[in-house]
Amino acid sequence: MKRYLFPIISVILGISLFALIWFLLVGKKEETPLKPPSFPKGEISLPKEIEESGANLLKINQKDSLGYFKKDNYLYFFDLSGNLYFYDLNSNQLFEETGVKFENLIGFKVSPNKEKLILIWQENNKKRFSLFDLKTKKVFLLPEVNEVNFSLFDSNKGVFFKEEKEKSSVIGEVDFSDQSLKPLYEIDAYDLLVYFPQKDLIVFLDRPSHFVESSVFFLDLKTKKVENLIKKQAFFAKPTGVMIKFFDDGSFLLAFPSLRKLQFFSKERKLLFDFDFFTFPEKCQKNENLLFCAAPLELDEKASLPDEWYQGKLNFPEAIYKINLENGLKEKIYQTEISDIIDLEVISSNQISFFDRVSGSVYLFTY
């Protein structure tokens, strides 16, 4: 009996030892962070290391970025290869969405609800546009146009401009649900920027350049009447390269680079502030009754603006100001040595994020 029992015991011990080794080496899996609600598909990589850039400054990305945007408690950005990343503001962790990559990506625009992106890419040296849905990960090629933008009031609506060689160019409405175009207004012009700040209002202007005398036109879609906002003001010189930025509530900034002037208007087009400093509208963000702006501290008076700024030829020290829009008081909260800060976002009462075009980096700043 003992002669048969010993082999059986040996087999049992061998199986137990193998099971223990397998559990120690394989059975214990590393936990993978949960995906945020806007990423139902694709793979999520493990957290990447975040680089500390100073006591109050946190660099988010490791690779140069095309820019970023904020949605809920996440900061999303593309690197120069078209890979998509997101940073969790709650856990302070950075993740890569490995199921998404766009070749030849040169920029993007974000819808009001932050759920859709207009992707800007190049094909045979020609600018093209696609619509990317963050929830479904579906991509739709938009019809060939020269410029397209989201409306501020409906993420399924937008505005487009299309140049025509043998007839008048067209400004119209885009329906992003089926990628259809609806012509609304004919115009003899080319290379226009277009905006859709209100349901019955389209704004258009020449692409800003030092060599182009500027006008900013407000088109009432009900009456088809057009108003030139620039003609309502008297300037000591004709402004060129005028730039505009609309905020979610319909208010907007108007910048006159050739005159080094910056103005803030209400939704009703009433001039509220003529600031004592100059900066480019892309360097500002409005949050309730506060305006945050990164402003150059040294700007060559001979520089051709905004052309040299668009071309990345200007680097300068900057200050970030917090401006109270109720009384106009200005407070400096940060100063850089060399930077080109754009796309400020308010994270909390003492924290903002921004993108630096010089370093190609996204930063979190606590003040």
Language-model regions, residue ranges each:
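Beta-propeller blade signature
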Residues: L131-K135, E173-S177, F217-K222, K261-K267, ...
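Sequence/structural signature of beta-propeller modules
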Residues: M1-K63, K71-N73
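Beta-propeller domains
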Residues: L75-G99
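Short, solvent-exposed loop/turn segments at conserved positions within beta-propeller repeat blades
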Residues: F77-L80, Q122-K127, E163-S169, R207-S214, ...
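Residue-level marker for isolated small/hydroxyl-bearing positions within beta-strands
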Residues: F78, Y87, I120, F160-E163, ...
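Conserved beta-propeller blade repeats
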Residues: K63-K70, K101-I118, V139, P143-V159, ...
